[in-house]
Regions:
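Short amphipathic alpha-helices and their capping/turn segments at secondary-structure boundaries
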Residues: 34-47, 51, 144-163, 216-235
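A structural motif corresponding to the C-terminal end of an alpha-helix
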Residues: 106-118, 209-236, 277-301
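Histidine-centered active-site loop/cap adjacent to the catalytic His
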Residues: 328-381
């Protein structure tokens, strides 16, 4: 563990930035002056981390079980004139290695700062190991160098407004938890809620997730130092995760029945839904907020950003022949799919196109405010651009 030497790094970074830039990165003095002297250039905003910020599931505008017309207009990879489907239309070349960086990913859809250069280095499935520098255990992921390495190379010589990071969910094993809960629901014999067994296991893993986030932010700071960007010259933001599922009282398929699987794409017991929404996601958020404070980073709390917009929520509807998708009424999260005909399984329970527009709006609001910790929420009945920012709760 490296947290013992991490705590003081941000406090002394300004004083040592020149040495780190000149010696640690092997830059010449002229190179450093060049990096700081391009103030007139459009500033960069960079995203690093996992699938919740890379743009996984951005292919979908809502959910539909009707395959006609590109699943009732929800499939953004579908071209109506040619009647062809190609996920590269949404994910570009990143579809080939599975990073799935969508055109509507948070950093791309954020309205602020206006005219900024957007760079999305995040990759679906990434753990902290995919972010760390090689000397601290970082390694290539999906045939790409570690994200901290990519960051250092990309921003050297360019002004940077902000670096926003989403990390921790995969270190915690969030996907494994969801899979276990779904399997518990669909098991023909002996089906039972997962919360009683998963909750204590997740609690045990939260400290390690916190350490992973702290170490990731430390290496992002180091990479920025080496690129000629001392702490304080840019904004470092760690964000949490929105809940993809409603609590058990707000699901539009009552009774723990199989229509949650066959129609809704939310195969979970009420007890598990309530645990995930009311305890799991908030606990993750609280833990990440603590990591941000230790690292000297801002914190963007997204844990309640999708309230009322989750998969199978009573206040959303699926698209169909008589219901076109819209950000006001459709779900903002991709429903659970096997990947047979409806995109990829890995898109399940990720922010879809509307959800990503909402997260982009949250980031824009964060960057418009004075640096600090904030919570982003939506406006009931309005679209994904009508997000609101308030103070983050203190834990």
């Amino acid at each position: 563990m490296r947290t013992s030497w991490v705590r003081g790094r941000r406090r002394i970074a300004v004083a040592t930035a020149a040495v780190a830039a000149l010696c640690g990165a092997g830059l010449t003095q002229g190179g450093t002056v060049h990096a700081q002297g391009k103030a007139a250039e459009t500033p960069w905003v960079v995203s690093l981390g996992d699938s919740f910020i890379s743009g996984e599931a951005g292919r979908w505008s809502g959910n539909s079980n009707d395959s006609a017309g590109g699943y009732s207009g929800t499939d953004r990879a579908f071209d109506q004139p040619s009647r062809t489907t190609d996920a590269h239309r949404v994910y570009g070349a990143s579809y080939d290695n599975g990073c799935n960086r969508s055109d509507s990913a948070e950093v791309n859809s954020s309205p602020a700062p206006a005219g900024a250069h957007r760079l999305n280095l995040a990759c679906s499935g990434a753990t902290s190991t995919a972010i760390l520098l090689p000397e601290h255990g970082g390694s290539p992921f999906k045939s790409e160098p570690s994200q901290a390495e990519q960051l250092q190379m990309a921003v050297t010589g360019h002004p940077v407004r902000a670096v926003v990071v989403s990390v921790g969910g995969n270190d915690l094993g969030f996907e494994d938890v969801i899979v276990a809960c779904a399997k518990g629901f669909v098991t023909p014999i002996g089906a039972s809620p997962c919360a009683p067994t998963q909750a204590p296991e997740v609690k045990k893993r939260l400290p390690a997730m916190r350490t992973a986030a702290v170490n990731s932010l430390a290496d992002v700071t180091t990479a920025m130092d080496r690129a000629g960007h001392p702490a304080g010259s840019y904004r470092l933001i760690l964000q949490s995760y929105p809940s993809p599922l409603p609590d058990g009282a707000r699901i539009r398929y009552p009774g723990d029945k199989y229509d949650r699987l066959t129609d809704g794409g939310c195969p979970f017991f009420d007890k598990d839904l309530t645990w995930a929404h009311d305890q799991l996601v908030p606990d993750i958020s609280t833990t990440l907020a603590s990591a941000a404070r230790e690292s000297g980073a801002e914190f963007l709390d997204l844990s309640r950003a999708f309230d009322g917009r989750e998969v199978c929520s009573t206040t959303t509807v699926q698209a169909g022949p008589s219901q076109r998708p819209t950000g006001r009424t459709s779900e903002w999260v991709r429903f659970v799919t096997t990947g047979a005909g409806q995109g990829q399984r890995q898109e399940s329970l990720h922010p879809n196109h509307y959800g990503q527009l909402a997260l982009g709006a949250c980031l824009g609001l964060q960057l418009d405010r004075t640096p600090g910790d904030h919570r982003c929420t939506n406006t009931p009945g309005e679209g994904p651009r009508a997000m609101r920012l308030g103070p983050a709760p203190r834990s």
